[in-house]
Amino acid sequence: FKTGLVGFLLFGVISLNAVAEVRLLEGWTRSPPPGVDRLAIYGRLVNDGDTPVVLSRLELAGAGQVMLHETVMDAGQMRMRHIDPIELSPSKALVMAPQGLHLMVMGLARSPQAGETLTIKATTRLDEVHTFLVRVQPITALGPVPN
């Protein structure tokens, strides 16, 4: 019995330590113009774990979809390309910035205003859930406001 209990406890500790910590650093967005139901989120997605993490689902309450997009030049036109799945290597950052990678939020039920904080829920292929906080900046913002 003691051996089984010790094994169970060790397995539980090992399992807890195996969960990767995925964070969004300096997450920010601009308040969208009136009548626009979408916005782009920027920042650095970081996997602090020892193994790769694949994000399979992103959600924001009151929005239809959240997806990773890349802005690319195609035949002289700037276009957004959907990237799926979102793979995060250990100890590396996925940098999201204007005119590059970004989380695209579409189908907003209402426009968030400057000063609000949005919460993105990210689910991995292993059903681990991470939450990311995103600060809403004025429409004229060029980057995140320091804390």
Model-inferred region functions:
Residues 1-8:
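Bacterial N-terminal signal peptides that target proteins for export
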Residues 1, 19-22:
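Absolute protein N-terminus
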Residues 13-15, 19:
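N-terminal signal peptide c-region/cleavage motif recognized by signal peptidases
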Residues 21-147:
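Compact, glycine-rich, soluble single-domain proteins
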